[in-house]
Amino acid sequence: IEKAGTTLENETVLGDLVIAESVGEGNVTLKNVTVLGSVIVKGGGANSVYFDGVRVGGAVRLEKEGVHLRLRGDTALERVEIGLPCRITRDSTFEGALGALVIDLAKESAKEIQIEVPAKRVELLSRTNVALNADVETLRIDRDAEGAQLDIKRGVMVGELSIDARVALTGSGLVVSLVVSVSGVTVSGSLTVEKTGTEGGAKAPTTSGGSSGGSSGGSYVPVKIVTGAAAVPDV
């Protein structure tokens, strides 16, 4: 797709689909489209790429800084890869969840990545700032994400959060189970952590601004993303 304003509807793409750089900041809409390969997004702006009833067999690769991917209807994405800061949101008709969301930036950026769609699994592989405004079953922060910040918004729940790098956890959401393998992790006092564990001799996270409500004991009940719920409002 090379032109802004393009709508692709009721089609099956046998290979990869590329939204080209020539789209610029323009709009592109995919409606009732099945892509057997991957979708590579190189064009589009802050309010421009819409997936409505889209199914992708491979990955959706977001390679344009500042692009906004908006999900609608029964869109089903098993894997989304973020290569540059962007935003992923949903409207009230989207009732699913991303299978896997992998954040691995091609270059370091101070700009925030905004995730407003539920996901079964999230992997943060590089240093960046992430605002999480939807539930996640499991989230892993890799050692290469040293210095990253994860802002878990109010009303958002992360089931299992494992951390292998010195990062900052902020926000006022809920983490059911937190496990750290390095010392130096900080947790905002407004964030609720039900259970905290350490591995490899790491020190427990330090808390600022009050109590996180955490506990080193108790049992963990896995969180399951239930589709069909209403969209989480922006905070």
Which role does the model predict for each range below?
Residues 1-177, 183-195, 203-205:
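Short, T/G/N/S-enriched strand-turn elements that build extracellular solenoid repeat scaffolds
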Residues 178-181, 187-233:
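Ser/Thr/Gly/Pro-rich low-complexity, disordered linker/stalk segments of secreted
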